Structures are given as structure tokens and as C-alpha cells.
Amino acid sequence: MKNLLSMEALTVHEIEHLLEQAAQFKRGKKATFNEQTFAVNMFFEPSTRTHTSFEVAEKKLGVEVVSFDAASSSMTKGETLYDTLLTMQAVGVNVAVIRHSEENYYAGLEKLDIAIVNGGDGCGEHPSQSLLDLFTIKEQFGTFQGLKVAIAGDIRHSRVANSNMKVLKRLGAELFFSGPREWFDESYLAYGTYLSVDEIVEKVDVLMLLRVQHERHSGTDEFTKESYHEKFGLTENRAKQLKEDAIIMHPSPVNRDVEIADSLVESEKSRIVTQMTNGVFIRMAILEAILKEQEMRAKLCTY
């Protein structure tokens, strides 16, 4: 695997391999790269979980993390992302994890030798989040085949939803959507069925809630926090309708008492904190796959 840019670029076999490697890391597997392996985390949008867990993953693998601050870089002088990455490549950085506000920012960057991991591109995709979600689901159920999974909330503006709806259908899950119709595109019906939140809670195995992404909305919000929670959120009463073995997920950050009642965030059915923990292990697996391929290519070039 040279880069990780989208879930669609991964085969089912590659996905299964990454999930298995993440499971091995969680069980205590060790993998250390030499001290001349470098990573840079380039985040042009705010991030807590993705940024932190990638850095922890890098350090657990023995990878040196190169500091980068967009606000103090030459990009403020007009340097392009391509030329910035060309610089990173020239000084010996092996892999760049990039979070960017523009969808498909990575177009044209694939020809560089430095590996690129998409840490989220606008409303486009978030492949490492999708993989950690898959890892969390597989840990719980052991399979995706036949699982009923609901994606509920601000779907149109969610890169997580874009990644997950495509891959979950490919892996054999049955998908449902819920949330405001204003934030739902009819094209999503190619992947699943739209139902009200009251209809989905009693039938799904996995309820995947999405944050209301105020920063990507134009104009005045159509819902107050209270009205959104009442109409579309997972209230305490709705949670009582969930199946006994159903789980609750959320990519975070969570708007408590908006998408989900505050009391449910750390409840028995919630896997929200587990997702954060699993993020380190899946990102270790991603980095290991990329860096091992780089090592193999380097060895071939010496013959």
C-alpha cells in the first residue's frame, strides 16, 4: 500500500488485513522501524483524535515525528501543498498524514515518492476513521455480513458517512439512514434505506451517530440544540428501544444532548471511547503497511 487516500482504493482483502494487523497490535504485537524513519502530520483543520492518535501510533512504531505548523510554514507565503510535500520528501520524510478542508486535495500528489495518508478531506472521505469504525464493529460482532447499520445525523456534510456507507455495503451490511432530509442526498439511497430515527432504533445492530457540522453549513441553522435532539437525536427514551446487543457509535467530537443524550455517551452500549482507543491500533496498522512497502521498494532498488 503506497498511500491511503480513500476507502474505495482498498480491496476487501487489504481491509481485512489491516483489521487483523490492528487486532494484533491491540493484543500486544510489537513493530519498530529504524530511527531513520520519519512522519509529518500536516493538519489544516482542527483535530484532536485523528492528530493525536496518529502521533501516538507513529511513536509506538518507533517513527520519528517531524513537527509542522501550517500557520508558520511557507504556505503562508503562497507555497503550494505539492511543493511543501516535495520539500518533506527531499529532507527524508517517509509519510505525511494530511487533514485538509478541500475535497480531493491529494489529486496530483500521488506521483510524489513520499507516502500520503488522507486524514480527512473536507466533506470527502476519512479512510482511517472508517477503518477504525470497521475494526470496532468487527470486534463486537465478528462479521459485517447481514448486520443492520444505521448512519444518522448530518450525513451530507460528513466525510465519515461517505467512507462508511460505501465500504459497509461492500462488506455485506444492510444500511439505513436517518436525520434531517435537508442534510440528505437522494444519491445515498443507492447504499441503503432512509427511515425516521424512531423506526431505525429498534431494528439496527449498530447505530452510528454523526456530529452536526455547523462549520460546514451556510446560513442560519434550522434547528436549535433542543429541537434537533428531540427530532433526530438518540434520547434516553429512544435508547430503550435499541436491541439488547446493539451498539452506539460516534466519530466524535460529540455534541452532548444534541446527537446523543449526555447520559448515553459512556453507557454500556456505547463504543465511542472504544473507537478512540482503536484509532491508535488501526493507524499503527496503516502506517506499518505503508512503511513496509517502502522498505520493500528500497530493497528492490538496491539490486
UniProtKB/Swiss-Prot annotation:
Catalysed reaction equations from the record: carbamoyl phosphate + L-aspartate = N-carbamoyl-L-aspartate + phosphate + H(+)
Stretches assigned to coiled coil: none
Binding residues for carbamoyl phosphate: 49-50, 99, 126, 129, 252-253
Function: Catalyzes the condensation of carbamoyl phosphate and aspartate to form carbamoyl aspartate and inorganic phosphate, the committed step in the de novo pyrimidine nucleotide biosynthesis pathway.
GO cellular component: cytosol
Listed EC numbers: 2.1.3.2
Annotated protein name in UniProt: Aspartate carbamoyltransferase catalytic subunit
Gene Ontology terms: biological process: 'de novo' pyrimidine nucleobase biosynthetic process; 'de novo' UMP biosynthetic process; amino acid metabolic process
Pathway(s) served: Pyrimidine metabolism; UMP biosynthesis via de novo pathway; (S)-dihydroorotate from bicarbonate: step 2/3
Family: Belongs to the aspartate/ornithine carbamoyltransferase superfamily. ATCase family.
GO molecular function: amino acid binding; aspartate carbamoyltransferase activity
Family matches, as SUPFAM superfamilies: Aspartate/ornithine carbamoyltransferase
Residue positions binding L-aspartate: 77, 159, 211
Gene name of the encoded protein: pyrB
Pfam family, one: OTCace
Keywords: Pyrimidine biosynthesis, Transferase
InterPro entries according to UniProt: Asp/Orn_carbamoyltranf_P-bd, Asp/Orn_carbamoylTrfase, Asp/Orn_carbamoylTrfase_sf, Asp_carbamoyltransf, Asp_carbamoyltransf_Asp/Orn-bd
Quaternary structure (record): Heterododecamer (2C3:3R2) of six catalytic PyrB chains organized as two trimers (C3), and six regulatory PyrI chains organized as three dimers (R2).
